[in-house]
């Protein structure tokens, strides 16, 4: 049986978050939305890719370490969903600007044997107390992009932990806890900061300086992490270990508290 799947993952983190545009009255004049000159993430280089075919399985992701995590799972006899879970969790560590357990996702799953396509909507949702004025300033004007995104204001209710748990129950082969061995080890022992992650840190120095926790992690000694630096994240390992041991339930309790 062969499977293929596509993911569109969004992390509600300091470096990248999903922010909803403020609602405006129908009869009001359009209000320009300030983006604080926030440009899309810059590329770190172009590489010509050649077509590659595989007889049995293949793993691909936005980071080599995450790809290795997926490949190792497939090599052990895991399903495509097993590999996805290992890769997505690893991406939360190695590319925090774009992925994370605190975000949401769409998942498109193709069962080649049954010739059936199944889609999952696990996008993060706004908190219960959110109102249309959430991203308006004290004057009722739309907040600047970075002021709206950075910090807890833009955080939604995460969907990824529950998604991973649910699709594993449906399509997983390997034991749930075993899928998190790689990201836990990388977080505890250290992983190499990629050029892409380093570039994202350089582009977001001011927002990262606003909070002691982000400054300490991404800007040790006041300087941005350089590509090639070995970085450890024991707090991430602790969260993933909770996910491995207790499923998505802690993300509605222990972790979020």
Residue ranges and their predicted role:
Residues 20:
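Short, conserved catalytic or interaction motifs in soluble domains
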Residues 1-9:
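Bacterial N-terminal signal peptides that target proteins for export
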Residues 16-17:
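C-terminal motif of bacterial Sec signal peptides marking the signal peptidase cleavage site
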Residues 23-68, 72, 80-81, 85-257:
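Noncatalytic scaffold domains of N-terminal-nucleophile
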């Amino acid at each position: 049986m062969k499977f293929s799947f596509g993911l569109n993952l969004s992390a509600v983190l300091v470096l990248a978050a999903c922010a909803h545009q403020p609602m405006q009255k129908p009869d009001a004049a359009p209000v320009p939305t300030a983006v604080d000159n926030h440009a899309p993430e810059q590329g770190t280089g172009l590489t010509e890719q050649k077509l590659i075919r595989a007889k049995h399985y293949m793993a691909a992701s936005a980071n080599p370490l995450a790809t290795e995590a997926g490949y190792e799972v497939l090599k052990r006899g895991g399903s495509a969903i097993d590999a996805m879970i290992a890769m997505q969790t690893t991406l939360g560590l190695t590319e925090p600007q774009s992925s994370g357990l605190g975000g949401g996702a769409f998942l498109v799953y193709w069962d080649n044997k049954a010739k059936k396509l199944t889609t999952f909507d696990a996008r993060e949702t706004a908190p219960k107390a959110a109102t249309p004025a959430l991203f308006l300033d004290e004057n009722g004007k739309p907040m600047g992009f970075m002021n709206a995104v950075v910090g807890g204001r833009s955080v939604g209710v995460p969907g990824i932990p529950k998604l991973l748990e649910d699709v594993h129950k449906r399509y997983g082969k390997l034991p749930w806890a075993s899928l998190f061995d790689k990201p836990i080890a990388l977080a505890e022992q250290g992983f190499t900061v990629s050029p892409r992650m380093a570039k994202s840190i350089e582009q977001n120095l001011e927002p990262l300086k606003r909070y002691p926790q982000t400054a300490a992690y991404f800007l040790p000694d006041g300087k941005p992490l350089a590509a090639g630096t070995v970085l450890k994240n024991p707090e991430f390992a602790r969260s993933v270990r909770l996910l491995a041991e207790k499923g998505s339930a802690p993300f509605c309790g222990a972790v979020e508290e």
